């Protein structure tokens, strides 16, 4: 039997304490290329904290984060971005006073400079702009390339954040409630972008999302956190039907109703 492929991303006994409170409690998970894993749980379950530990916004009390089999626990957020972890936040993280095209160009420039010996392939500022325009076309933002990021509607800011992540060429895409604050018309657009990333087949995608209809439409795996602990992990239908999940996560929903939106946090 061939050996199992090395996970793209892995957490081993990942733990963080704030005083006497254990916010994430020895969570071990492996994530492979070509998969989309939704991380769900009730308000305060530790979902965003777990994301912050993976992307380097928080430092673990104990445990490890591995990327491609390499221990990256000691790296901060910038170092993990350079190594291949891309993150979109609940609140968009853009350069608001720069044009849309410049937001993407800066990501490409940062990636090129981080590539060291590959820097020579970039001959001019014009090359970065040309590539930025291609990413903007992929997220349908070409028409607003010269608009200040601050002036974009919320849905377009989300799309710009996806373009920036794509420009960084990460191995791991992390989306923290990507549909938060979006209108009914905007939600399908961002979901379509995530679908396209998944369909490419070579990226590892993690998603924190409180809308169960969104989770069911995107995820091929769900993990459930409750009080900082991993309480369920598996295919969506099985996880959603689990009595443990019904009690821990969907307890406020009518019995048998697994599609209701749950509290987020």
What are these regions (language model features)?
Residues 2-265:
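Glycine-rich phosphate-binding loops of nucleotide-dependent enzymes
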């Amino acid at each position: 039997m061939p050996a199992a492929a090395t996970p793209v991303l892995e957490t081993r006994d990942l733990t963080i304490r704030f005083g006497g409170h254990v916010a994430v409690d020895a969570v071990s998970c492996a994530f492979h290329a070509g998969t989309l894993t939704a991380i769900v749980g009730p308000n305060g379950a530790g979902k965003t904290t777990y994301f912050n530990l993976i992307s380097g916004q928080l430092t673990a009390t104990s445990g490890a984060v591995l990327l491609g089999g390499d221990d990256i626990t000691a790296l901060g957020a910038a170092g993990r971005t350079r190594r291949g972890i891309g993150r979109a936040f609940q609140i968009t993280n853009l350069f608001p006073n720069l044009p849309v095209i410049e937001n993407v160009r800066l990501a490409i420039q940062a990636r090129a400079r981080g590539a060291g010996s590959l820097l020579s392939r970039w001959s001019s500022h014009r090359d970065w702009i040309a590539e930025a325009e291609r990413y903007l076309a992929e997220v349908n933002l070409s028409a607003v390339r010269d608009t200040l990021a601050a002036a974009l509607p919320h849905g377009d800011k989300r799309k710009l954040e996806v373009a920036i992540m794509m420009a960084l060429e990460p191995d791991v895409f992390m989306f923290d409630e990507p549909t938060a604050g979006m209108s009914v018309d905007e939600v399908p657009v961002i979901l379509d972008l995530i679908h396209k990333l998944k369909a490419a087949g070579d990226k590892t995608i993690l998603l924190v999302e409180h809308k169960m209809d969104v989770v069911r439409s995107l995820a091929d795996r769900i993990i459930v956190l409750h009080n900082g602990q991993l309480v369920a992990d598996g295919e969506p239908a099985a996880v959603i039907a689990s009595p443990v999940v019904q009690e821990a996560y969907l307890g406020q929903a009518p019995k048998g109703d697994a599609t209701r939106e749950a509290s987020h946090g």
